[in-house]
UniProtKB/Swiss-Prot annotation:
GO terms for cellular component: membrane. This is Protein DETOXIFICATION 34. It comes from Arabidopsis thaliana (Mouse-ear cress). It comes from the Eukaryota. The chain crosses the membrane at residues 97-117, 127-147, 176-196, 204-224, 240-260, 272-292, 316-336, 344-364, 390-410, 435-455, 462-482, 491-511.
Amino acid sequence: MEIPVREERRSSSSSAGPLQQTISLAADDAIDSGPSSPLVVKVSVFETEHETTKLIHAPSTLLGETTGDADFPPIQSFRDAKLVCVVETSKLWEIAAPIAFNILCNYGVNSFTSIFVGHIGDLELSAVAIALSVVSNFSFGFLLGMASALETLCGQAFGAGQMDMLGVYMQRSWLILLGTSVCLLPLYIYATPLLILLGQEPEIAEISGKFTTQIIPQMFALAINFPTQKFLQSQSKVGIMAWIGFFALTLHIFILYLFINVFKWGLNGAAAAFDVSAWGIAIAQVVYVVGWCKDGWKGLSWLAFQDVWPFLKLSFASAVMLCLEIWYFMTIIVLTGHLEDPVIAVGSLSICMNINGWEGMLFIGINAAISVRVSNELGSGHPRAAKYSVIVTVIESLVIGVVCAIVILITRDDFAVIFTESEEMRKAVADLAYLLGITMILNSLQPVISGVAVGGGWQAPVAYINLFCYYAFGLPLGFLLGYKTSLGVQGIWIGMICGTSLQTLILLYMIYITNWNKEVEQASERMKQWGAGYEKLEKIAT
């Protein structure tokens, strides 16, 4: 009775596309192999037949579960393409949505700190805004960039089945980021003279410098927080991050009210609440890793002290790549502040950047998701799955960006009312709306491409590309158009758009010519190099 059933299944799958046939046949082989026999699945990777007898526990994009080890076969029909799109879309948003929500909650910690401080006084609000946007934002971007090396290493190690190395990589990153935080201490300690040197009013700089020294513990919390985040992201364990972010934001609001409104601690209370919330997030994530991530966490290990120098170089390349992007937009604001009528120029640009920042939170989530997808699939030896995940993500992100741009253009005369009642400011914002729309489209692609770069381990070349496109092309062009023509703030922004466009085109071309089979081989070599301690851990475990 078993044979006719199997023949019927194979017959029914013959009319489907190659992708669906592979799924059906793989499932048949799994059923017929029996519970006691090893699973043997024939899959097509690198255009040749391979037999795999050991499943890798990276998430399979083929079956949508953790029971598959096959790469996607080539797409040969619209039905195949549709199935790939459905599977990849599901995988993408399972990761991206919780990460985006977590980022929104973290952004809310800063926002509510400013809101509560704003009720203390305008001077205090200006001082805290400077402390958070200049000093804290600088260290935030640099530490986040340093931790991004884990997106490459943990993601590919997870795909390759080297689960024990995930905890080692995380501990190694903890050490490096804690050391980096020590190096960044002078920026906090000497914030007051540095801010005065940058042209800030002495009274504001004095208060800002005092607040900055009080939030030093928050910086060290980030050194623990970021590597732990990347550890969880690489395994797609992002739901817990969203819950921790939500409870942390709720607790932060309560502590702010308690310290500022009840205890009347003023700025000291705001700084204390900021530190407590940051460490609460870091500790909660570590507790979850130690208690519920037994596959990746095997306890503290001396292996974390091995290969620190090459790990540091990859971390530094990741930091430079990210910081060049963050500082690019900060520099645009600085240039705008030296134009005629800087109040309207900076105000209108800040409103547009604020709107762009809210859209950016979504794409930061997508950035992390595609980084996880690419690194997992390369580590698993799935070149087509990596390629298809990139294609699907780029298309969907572009559609979202276009929709956002259309909404901005339709409401260009009205959306600024959220931020200001000034008719002059609203008109200035409306004049910039078309540039905001173009920027939103570009920003729908740029984070995705950066995520692919991190997932593939391309940080160093992308850092050079960013340096050229942003600082050798975009900023000089913006300076010329803004100061040497009558375009003003629009000219500066056009220069920024040109730099971002050039960077996006270059990276899209890099992805277009990428040999994904070769990327799999490089990922395998990287795991052999970086996972030197994996065999030691296996021996210890046995």
